[in-house]
From Swiss-Prot:
Keyword Cytoplasm applies: yes
Organism: Brucella ovis (strain ATCC 25840 / 63/290 / NCTC 10512)
Subunit composition and interactions: Monomer.
EC number: 6.1.1.16
Disulfide feature: none
Protein name in UniProt: Cysteine--tRNA ligase
Taxonomic lineage of the native organism: Bacteria, Pseudomonadati, Pseudomonadota, Alphaproteobacteria, Hyphomicrobiales
Recorded catalytic activity of this chain's protein: tRNA(Cys) + L-cysteine + ATP = L-cysteinyl-tRNA(Cys) + AMP + diphosphate
Main location: cytoplasm
Length: 506
């Protein structure tokens, strides 16, 4: 850890407090985040945890060194929704081939979309279908320890059996008792369950569905429940490579540092992950810190297809900024729109609900244009080290306070501190070197234009606006437009001050 690095503090859902982060092993900092179920295009709500935990990944690498951080984000490629989509989209194909087409194409689209949003690739992205052995072994251990049982070719976990043992209590993460959870839950009260709160670890596959050899002596083919997948994959990627796993009796080696996801996953998914992992591995905790990002709304309403406001990441990249027009290379255009979406999301603290609006996206794009314009004017180069990003790092070390970090970037821009601006943007994943150095970026085209003269005209127009001389202000705007220069007015979201940018139009 750099001597100058501030203390990283993170809000822990498990304890409901902001805690100083102390890794189990500073040379092997480990984080697991629940990833996509690959059956459909990812929506902008799915983008939020990807961006939030990418910022944390970057911060951990900055503090502890890139080679000392492992970030695992899973891919769920076994699910009823995948089966339904495969049957709908590829009815003429053999079912397993149809499923493979759905998962491969959807995952490829997800990877392209989140890359356009400025995210690094996680260290590992385990797929559920690649870890069936670990799932079966973990389920067998849970049955052996008496917290899971076999019924009608299903294997179920018993929270009440867990609570009868020494160790963590079921419901500690959600802070609800079994009775409270049962009262508020819509659970499948199947006849083979011993108790209503029991949940599925493994279930038999129906005819034609994908299936694998079952655990616990079950002879029919089956497939895993949702929750066991993440317990097994986190064990495979964050415990076993570092000496932990089912063969290890050391509790410290059988837990990792951070587990993240959306607030909607606290119960039942994360609660059930904890139950499975702690009972199988003999630990008090699965992860030391649990982090959850807040919900997302669109223009003040819950996002839903029925309201007509369901927005995918691809929608934002393709159509979110129509003023960009067509570029020669639309993958580059996607990256610019993705950076604007990233900045828009990071203006809300990750634990707070976020209101996605077209106006904020456009304002974020304009602000990025100003920042990159300064970096281009000053010949900023891609930094090898982030030695001037201390203000942004300090803000992010306070429970990922991205709003304070953006305020630091705005201050750096205001005083033209190019190193602090560029390196701070890099730490937040907002710096794409291409947009700094490339000469043919459409939004930075300034052919045969005197930038200083335009700046003087803009200043003159601002004086007229302040004097409420609207006619003269409009005259300058119209004259510039006739010369091929379009002015764009907006407000600084922090200060409320008018900001005027310009672009060359045909």
């Amino acid at each position: 850890m750099p001597d100058t690095a501030p203390q990283l503090r993170l809000y822990n859902t498990l304890t409901r407090t902001k805690e100083a982060f102390a890794p189990i092993d500073a040379k092997n900092v480990r984080m697991y985040v629940c990833g996509p179920t690959v059956y459909d295009f990812a929506h902008i709500g799915n983008a939020r945890p990807v961006i939030v935990f990418d910022v944390l990944f970057r911060l951990l690498r900055h503090v502890y060194g890139a080679q000392h951080v492992t970030y695992a984000r899973n891919i769920t490629d076994v699910d009823d929704k995948i089966n339904a989509r495969a049957a709908r989209d590829y009815p003429d194909l053999p079912f397993n081939e149809a499923i493979r087409k759905v998962t491969e194409s959807t995952n490829a689209q997800f990877q392209a979309d989140v890359t356009a949003l400025g995210n690094l690739q996680p260290t590992v992205q385990p797929r559920a279908t690649e870890h069936m052995d670990e799932m079966r072994a973990m389920i067998d251990r849970l049955v052996q320890r008496g917290v899971a049982y076999v019924a009608q070719d299903h294997v179920l976990f018993s929270p009440s059996a867990m609570d009868a043992r020494k160790g963590p209590r079921y419901g500690a993460l959600a802070r609800r008792s079994l009775d409270e959870m049962l009262a508020g839950a819509r659970v499948d009260v199947a006849s083979y369950k011993r108790d209503e709160m029991d949940f599925v670890l493994w279930k038999p596959s129906k005819k034609g569905e994908p299936g694998w050899p079952s655990p616990a002596g079950i002879e029919t083919l089956g497939r895993p429940g949702w929750h066991i997948e993440c317990s097994a994959m986190s064990m495979a990627k964050l415990l076993e490579p570092f000496g932990g796993g089912l063969k290890c009796d050391d509790p410290e080696r059988n837990q990792f540092d951070i587990h993240g996801g959306g607030i909607d996953l606290v119960f039942p998914h994360h609660e059930n992950e904890i139950a499975q992992s702690c009972c199988a591995l003999g630990t008090e905790r699965m992860a030391n810190i649990w982090m959850h990002n807040g919900f997302l709304q669109v223009e003040g309403q819950k996002m839903s297809k029925s309201l007509g406001n369901f927005i995918t990441i691809r929608d934002v990249l393709n159509d979110g900024l129509p003023q960009l027009g067509e570029w020669g290379d639309n993958t580059v255009r996607d990256r610019w729109a993705g950076l604007a979406a990233r900045l828009s999301m990071l203006q809300t603290h990750y634990r707070e609900p976020i209101n996605w609006t077209a106006q904020r996206l456009a304002e974020s794009a304009d602000e990025l244009h100003r920042w990159y314009g300064l970096l281009r004017d000053e010949g900023f180069g891609a930094p090898e080290k982030l030695s001037h990003a201390s203000a942004v790092a300090a803000a992010l070390c306070d429970d990922l306070n991205s709003w304070a970090a953006i305020t630091a970037l705005r201050q750096a821009f205001k005083v033209r501190d190019v190193a602090a601006l560029g390196e701070g943007m890099a730490l937040m994943g907002l710096l794409d070197p291409y947009f700094v150095t490339a000469s043919d970026v459409p939004i930075f085209a300034r052919a045969d234009v005197d930038a200083s003269a335009i700046a003087a005209r803009i200043a003159e127009r601002l004086n007229f606006i302040n004097a409420k001389n609207w006619a003269e202000a409009d005259r300058i705007r119209d004259e510039l437009l006739q010369e091929g220069v379009q002015l764009k007015d907006s407000k600084d979201s922090a200060t409320g001050e008018r900001i005027t940018t310009w672009d060359v139009v045909g």
